[in-house]
């Protein structure tokens, strides 16, 4: 909104020189981060009190899991993702270029998945059960929205004449010449990336602060990636494909970081509120959509390797148990396995943060290793 105001004033004779700052992505990304942080922190205390009053017993805690969680975390309200999403959307409306197709595609995914997560959280809280919507219901809804968003990108996102067909191509990291055009099969691949990463973040959100910090690391990494591939000079220097308009997603990444910091203010151990599916599904979907827009889907698997590992641990556990009746891990997702081994919750969380930070640096390194 402010960016559009700047462009309107720039065409007149009344604009102030200070408004020229608005044309810089770096400035708007920083302001988006600050705005989202302020919104999340400002609404935090009142929102938490309201959620406690509305939810009563708070988020249901698994009774077959870590015993101390039942006593330590009982009564903690959920749906804290609303704080992050409020900051994200306010910041996006203020600082992003609202004519940009990529911005609206990411907001479509984020808002839709946030609504789906809210429905899941609401079902859990009202029924006081850890089972909300069925997995099939969530997956079908996620894939439908992701397919629609991907088709919009393919048809309407700006294209570079230097890289025809890139909108349906899969770009491999490190190997700069390895690009495979999947045609319309790319729609299924992109939808899987978005929905899969959304659920991976959701599975990781099981301990205080565990998911949100790796989300911020991933958002920082993809904010830089989006900025680079959206700038022809940087993309050419680094031998990256040029993706017109994708740089604007750096603003949304800044907003995710700011909203995440504001949420972490209240989610730091002992958590006063949980993110819930409202936040985890939305943020995972947002990162998946940003990776698709930037054509760095495979790099997301590296940067978000912690989330991928959490999801794989669940799939391995379920598949192996169905086949043999035995478990590979003491408990899945894998962060609970380490708790069962005797690691304190804070140790698990901080070590997982370290792993996610290392993976983020490795993901960034692929930009230069070509």
Curated annotation (Swiss-Prot):
Cofactor requirement: Mg(2+)
Pathway: Cell wall biogenesis; peptidoglycan biosynthesis
UniProt keyword DNA-binding, yes or no: no
Classification via InterPro entries: Glycosyl_transferase_4, PNAcMuramoyl-5peptid_Trfase, PNAcMuramoyl-5peptid_Trfase_CS
Keyword Ubl conjugation appears in the UniProt entry: no
Gene Ontology cellular component annotations, sorted alphabetically: plasma membrane
Reaction equation(s) it catalyzes: UDP-N-acetyl-alpha-D-muramoyl-L-alanyl-gamma-D-glutamyl-meso-2,6-diaminopimeloyl-D-alanyl-D-alanine + di-trans,octa-cis-undecaprenyl phosphate = di-trans,octa-cis-undecaprenyl diphospho-N-acetyl-alpha-D-muramoyl-L-alanyl-D-glutamyl-meso-2,6-diaminopimeloyl-D-alanyl-D-alanine + UMP
Main location: membrane
Family annotation (HAMAP family): MraY (MF_00038)
NCBIfam families reported in the protein's UniProt record: mraY (TIGR00445)
Family note: Belongs to the glycosyltransferase 4 family. MraY subfamily.
Name used for this protein in its record: Phospho-N-acetylmuramoyl-pentapeptide-transferase
Native source organism of the sequence: Caulobacter vibrioides (strain NA1000 / CB15N)
Protein's gene: mraY
